Amino acid sequence: VSWAIYDPGHGGVDSGAVGPGGTRESDVNLSIAWQAHAATVMAHGESWLTRWADGCLSLANRAAQANYLDNAGAFVSIHCNSNGPDAHGFEVYHFPHSPAGITLATAIRDAVAHEVPALAMRGDRNGLKADGRLAVLRKTKMPAVLVECAFLSNPNEEAWLAKVETQVRLGRTIAGATMAFLAGRS
């Protein structure tokens, strides 16, 4: 059985982005990751979080945790974006030279587009973006993606991301796509 590794971005003194209404990215990321973990376990899958509470971890530590698990099959780093009040949408980053990473990114993008059709897709290829500079994509041994769920800098998306229902929906959708990806590789 392959494990899904969910990495709630930021944490501790590193809150990540903070929306105009005060919503902290690290808190939203952790909640979505917990929802993904719970959905995976409820579906009899195996899951691990790189951080289980509000604490600060280095990027190297996040990748090392995933690489330590022999059966880690997918690494999903969960984030919220920030780039001005008018920026909006969802995107998934993947390592440019990883066909499996591209497949995982596409699965998550497609699932979110289906479950949340009102959420615009951003990136180079309609919600997908290649980036070889991100440490968690570069240093993990398994297929890895970094999900930017929406923009905390946009007041409308911040209000949406702050809702528990949104966090549950995104977590379950990300988990479902990740588990389908893992099932296709076994």
Model-based region annotation:
Residues 2-4, 26-186:
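Active-site-proximal helix/loop segments of hydrolytic enzymes
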Residues 2-22:
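Short glycine-rich His-centered loop
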